[in-house]
Amino acid sequence: MFKIIACINKRGVIGNHGKLLYSIKNDMKNFKSMTIGNVVIMGRYTFESLPKKKPLKDRINIIITKDNEYNVEASDNVFIVHSISEAVELTTTMFSDKEWFVIGGSTIYRQFLDEGLVDEMRLTYVDDDAEGNVKFPMFNTDSWYTYYESLTQTESYFPFTFRVLKKK
């Protein structure tokens, strides 16, 4: 099954105009430690929001796009697919020995949740109410339980917690 990683605030906002809403060092460190050596799955816009539009180093990068002409610089750790089902087939056949992380954006999160493909969400909750134009999709909280929650930390003026939610 797939795991979601996201950083969201009290309003459910995850981004604004192609950029992450928060740059929290501990969140980035946590993200890196979980995903290194594993598979990250993202939509094209999330990929294009990465620094220099380059794949994440030391990870298998799977980019989902509807654009059949979409291409990126040749790399042995980047795969372009055109649907959730193609991403699922690729990960389950070629990368069954790795963990699979869905890293955004909102539409990709929604599709994986709607298909029932996610069994764990690793969320950084920021105690802030900033607005943005990209939100984490609504999900049925009754179907999930909190497996882990960190103590509240503060960095860059924002209190935050790490939570791991697992599917009931």
Predicted regions and their residues:
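Enzymes that bind and transform nitrogen-containing heteroaromatic metabolites
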Residues: M1-K168
